[in-house]
Amino acid sequence: VVADNPQLIDINMISNGPGGGGGGPGGGGGDWFHVNGVAYNEDLDQIAFSSRFASEIYIIDHSTTTAEAASHSGGNSGMGGDILYRWGNPSNYNMSGNQTIPSAVHDVRWIKDDGRPNGGFLQIFNNKGVSNNQSTVDGIDAPIDPNNPYNYYRAVGQPFGPSSFTTRYVCAYSAPGQSASDRMYNGNIFVNASGGQGGAGVMYEVDQNGTIVWGPYNADTQKAFRYECEHPGIVSLQPFMNSTATTSCFS
């Protein structure tokens, strides 16, 4: 029974995905799942990934051995290669509940838990979070299992929580596909609304009030990243900067 096993993927859950085929791998619908974002959490030793066609995000255990990953036990979570957490579309495992990711989703990542606002939350670019023409950047506070800090709580017979996003920024510029976002140490949100598939094609940064404080700059990119000034790679560039050049880091 699919609903009794949300820790597993139902290969028939995407019956007619945009990848061009009716569920399951291979054939004309070989891109039936379309994973487009992967993030690693070193503290938890876990991996998160997002599926564009499933309209869902997932977490799996990275601490397992190869043998454990092929089973249902082992690793820090004790669940082997099973799905530890999933969010966005409970109908994928035959449960009722809010479909919080109505269509495409991209660039799942953990917000760094280093003192910045909402540290430890998952963050996604929800391409059609409000409507077909309105994207959002959503934060999700995944509920930790009180009996195992490497697992996630789910009430029996209920979908994984929370029932809705924990935080949301409604994008000033939207994109129906691709795209990325990140949370800066000061709480600002970096947004890259991709130019592909008719998107805005800009990148910009907003403060915690939603006011644009950097950009928007034209950027016909699929996914962009904003590195903070303290990043070791940025710091190492300082000796090589032209003395007449100015940047937001070396002004």
Residue ranges and their predicted role:
Residues 1-251:
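Histidine-/acidic-rich catalytic cores in large beta-rich domains
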